[in-house]
């Protein structure tokens, strides 16, 4: 019955908003005979269909003009000056290009008097870019007060994997940017941390499925760009907010028999502030959030069935007490009309303590054969500093910019392990200290053309991540011996790109090429007995991208895309030191991993009407040398039941799918939007060799399955002007390496009421109302089968208040 209710509610709930964009038109007027500039000449822009004036301008002392905020559409541009014959050009602004340089316009002297044209008019418009979807968080009521990961839950084509990573169209190979830049906070290609970034100070989130050559080549599934709020009004303005919540309100499955169990009814307190002060040519901005909470980020129940008849069950709850502070700020300087400079920085520090008691029970004998408890103390810190210089040439949109960025990520993690079984009673302690330092320098050049623009750029990025590993073993230690005490990973990236955009009346084209040279090394402690050789390699690769759009009408267009992408394993995927939160399911990296490459194809269509729009797409992606985690029994020690979960390159795979997004305003107070994403994952058969902790073969059977997800959101207004949002999400079964991930669903609900003469608002939000969004996986390995059920904290209720000034 509950599933039926959820299914029906899905049809009343993932509202998305396309970014709104206007265009700029520039040029310069000359006398055709003397080649002198024509100051104070008239430029008018009329609609093409009925020749009605839309807007216009008067040239400056040098004959230049710049007309801003022109809606997308088709126009006639008239140039006139007293004593000269007027001339006219056609202009097509379809959304691909935002700045049009009409170049040098010559007027011929004439004896006929010209009628002066009056300049008026402005109107808003909607960007029709088929490649980028922009989501405003202002109206995301059902997830208000939560994290960026919570906010993305209802976005079309977005899912999450077992480790809390964003999955776009079936893949977690996603690049996450903050204000257009990568940082150690969200990872360099290997995303992380989204579940710990509050969404209160985020203005919008962009999802780009087919990035152009301007973007780094990593992340074949796409790019997620998180954009912080930044006001442009003069004076002091901003907002201050406070959110309180309770999480893990119910249990999807009873805890196993331990004293601690799993945390429930977890309190959460998140104060936030957003400040902006602008005076003259200087703008100061600051955002800050603090998180004080108890949480349950993982709560995994495991059932393992071995070929010899043994059946073992366990539960690993990650009971967390956490404090986190994030400060993001900077200063914008307008040095003069042509030069600007921005200095910005981000500081993020988080400390948490995780505790767990884990009982391993033999189902056949109904006896506990092992009791394990652990305590993890971890401090993470991220520092990001950048300086951005921008030069604006005389021509609007003609810019040269340079960015210098330094980012540091620190991880200091200590595990205290206590183990009790028939073969040992003892204690172990491990500590990992990892400090990542990244320096990047990039420059970008943009030159508008008459019907497009050209973009050029270059980038240098240097990354270093040394790791210190300290073990304090007890008697009969469960820690693998001979791991060594250090490793050192580094990557140097040299890149350059060219990107060209051309926009015509019936079509537009964007084509680019990115070249990247990458040098990688990974030095290991010579003591390490499992990976005896250091690793070092380099490669040069080209990454083309192309987009073609055909316009049936301004509101009806088709696009075709192709791009080539890469996903490089980062140090977390390479790390040789196991994670001991579950001693019988040890997660470990592979220092010999290699990058995976993907060719992506897509055909998309968008049709818009006055009260809504329909987007549809067909996509196909071919991946070579993909890497993923492999489950394998470690039988090197007969006293322990250990399954390793090791990263490994596993050959080729394909991903083919369709996506639909529809949005409709039913009335002025009722909006309905929905998305559907269906895809086929094909994982090819593969045989390989695992080296840790002993060399052994594994076989990956070919897997072919169809999966889909659907999201529906309704927005409506209740009495007393209370805005409401109801969201439903459903993910079907899907194939994963060595098994399946089972279906799951969620219903979220939110209310928002403006108070204090609309200077404030109060929100109430409830996520996963029926507590059905846990992740369940079934794995078939060599010599065993297993079922993993992660009922982590998804059910949360929050109350928030915000004051705007």
Feature annotation, model-predicted:
Residues 25, 33-47:
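Short, ordered, surface-exposed loop/turn motifs in non-cytosolic proteins
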Residues 20, 64, 99, 116, ...:
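Membrane-proximal, glycine/serine-rich, low-complexity loop/turn segments characteristic
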Residues 404-409, 434-440, 446-466, 478-613, ...:
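Structural signature of Gram-negative outer-membrane beta-barrels, strongest in the C-terminal barrel
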Residues 251-256, 297-308, 354-366, 412-421, ...:
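Outer-membrane beta-barrel translocator domains and adjoining extracellular loop/strand segments
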Residues 48-64:
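Short, acidic Ser/Thr/Gly-rich low-complexity loop/linker segments typical of extracellular
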Residues 47-52, 74, 78-90:
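A short, solvent-exposed loop/turn motif at the edges and junctions
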Residues 205, 650-654, 671-743:
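C-terminal extracellular loops and terminal segments
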Residues 438-442, 481-485, 490-495, 590, ...:
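Outer membrane beta-barrel strand-and-loop segments of large Gram-negative receptors
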């Amino acid at each position: 019955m509950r599933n039926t209710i959820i299914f029906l509610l899905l049809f009343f709930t993932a509202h998305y908003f396309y970014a709104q964009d206007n265009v700029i038109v520039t040029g310069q007027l000359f006398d055709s005979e003397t080649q002198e500039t024509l100051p104070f000449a008239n430029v008018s822009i009329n609609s093409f269909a009925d020749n009605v004036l839309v807007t216009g301008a008067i040239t400056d002392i040098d004959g230049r003009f710049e007309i801003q905020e022109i809606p997308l559409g088709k126009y006639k541009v008239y140039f006139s000056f007293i004593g000269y014959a007027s001339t006219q050009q056609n202009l097509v602004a379809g959304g691909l290009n935002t700045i049009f340089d009409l170049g040098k316009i010559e007027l011929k002297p004439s004896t006929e008097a010209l009628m002066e044209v009056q300049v008026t008019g402005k109107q808003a418009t909607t960007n029709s870019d088929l490649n980028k979807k922009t989501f405003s968080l202002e109206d995301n009521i059902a997830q208000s007060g939560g994290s960026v990961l919570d906010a993305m839950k209802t976005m079309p084509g977005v899912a999450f994997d077992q480790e809390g990573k964003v999955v776009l169209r079936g893949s977690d190979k996603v690049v996450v940017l903050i204000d257009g830049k990568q940082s150690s906070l969200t990872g360099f290609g290997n995303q992380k941390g989204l579940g710990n970034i509050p969404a209160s100070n985020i203005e919008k989130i962009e999802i780009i499925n087919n990035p152009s050559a301007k973007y780094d080549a990593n992340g074949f599934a796409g790019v997620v760009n998180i954009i912080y709020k930044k006001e442009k009004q003069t004076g002091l303005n901003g907002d201050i907010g406070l959110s309180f919540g309770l999480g893990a309100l119910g249990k999807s499955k009873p805890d196993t028999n331990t004293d601690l169990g799993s945390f429930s009814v977890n309190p959460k307190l998140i104060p936030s502030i957003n400040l902006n002060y602008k005076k003259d040519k200087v703008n100061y901005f600051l955002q800050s959030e603090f998180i004080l909470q108890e949480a349950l980020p993982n709560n995994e129940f495991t059932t393992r069935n071995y070929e010899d008849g043994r059946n073992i069950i366990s539960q690993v709850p990650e009971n967390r007490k956490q404090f986190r502070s994030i400060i993001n700020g900077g200063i914008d300087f307008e040095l003069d009309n042509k030069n600007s400079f921005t200095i910005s920085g981000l500081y993020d520090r988080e400390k948490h303590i995780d505790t767990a008691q884990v009982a391993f029970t033999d189902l056949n004998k109904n006896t506990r054969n092992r009791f394990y408890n652990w305590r993890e103390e971890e401090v993470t810190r991220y520092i990001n500093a950048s300086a951005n210089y921008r030069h604006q040439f005389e021509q609007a949109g003609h810019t040269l910019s340079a960015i210098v960025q330094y980012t540091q990520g620190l991880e200091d993690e200590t595990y205290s392990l206590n183990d009790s079984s028939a073969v040992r009673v003892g204690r172990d302690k491990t500590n990992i200290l990892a400090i990542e330092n990244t320096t990047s320098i990039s420059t970008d050049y943009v030159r508008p053309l008459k019907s497009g623009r050209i973009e050029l750029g270059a980038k240098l990025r240097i990354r270093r991540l040394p790791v210190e590993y300290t073990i304090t073993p007890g008697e009969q230690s469960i820690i693998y011996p001979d791991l060594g005490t250090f490793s050192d990973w580094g990557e140097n990236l040299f890149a350059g790109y060219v990107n060209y955009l051309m926009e015509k009346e019936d079509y537009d084209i964007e084509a680019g090429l990115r070249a990247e040279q990458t040098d990688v090394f990974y030095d290991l402690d010579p003591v390490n007995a499992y990976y005896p050789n250091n690793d070092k390699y380099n490669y040069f690769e080209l990454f083309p991208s192309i987009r073609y759009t055909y316009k049936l009408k301004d509101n009806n267009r088709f696009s075709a895309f192709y791009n080539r992408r890469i996903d490089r394993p980062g140090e977390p995927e390479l790390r040789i030191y196991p994670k001991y939160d579950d001693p019988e399911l040890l997660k470990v990296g592979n220092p010999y991993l290699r990058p995976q490459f993907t060719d992506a194809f897509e055909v998309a269509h968008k049709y818009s009407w006055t009260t809504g729009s329909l987007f549809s797409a067909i996509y196909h992606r071919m991946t070579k040398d993909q890497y993923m985690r492999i489950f394998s029994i470690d039988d090197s020690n007969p006293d322990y039941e250990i399954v390793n979960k090791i990263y490994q390159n596993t050959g080729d795979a394909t991903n083919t799918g369709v996506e639909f997004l529809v949005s409709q305003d039913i009335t002025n107070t009722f909006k309905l939007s929905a998305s559907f994403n269906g895809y086929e994952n094909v994982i090819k058969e593969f045989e390989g060799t695992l080296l840790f902790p002993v060399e052994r073969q594994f076989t990956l059977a070919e897997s072919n399955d169809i999966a889909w997800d659907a999201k529906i959101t309704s927005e409506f207004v209740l009495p007393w002007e209370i805005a409401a949002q109801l969201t439903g999400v459903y993910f079907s079964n899907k194939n994963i390496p060595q098994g399946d991930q089972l279906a799951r669903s969620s219903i979220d609900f939110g209310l928002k009421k403006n108070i204090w003469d609309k200077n404030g608002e109060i929100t109430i939000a409830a996520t996963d109302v029926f507590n059905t969004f846990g992740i369940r996986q079934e794995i078939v390995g060599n010599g065993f089968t297993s079922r993993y059920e992660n009922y982590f904290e998804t059910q949360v209720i929050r109350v928030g208040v915000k004051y705007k000034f």
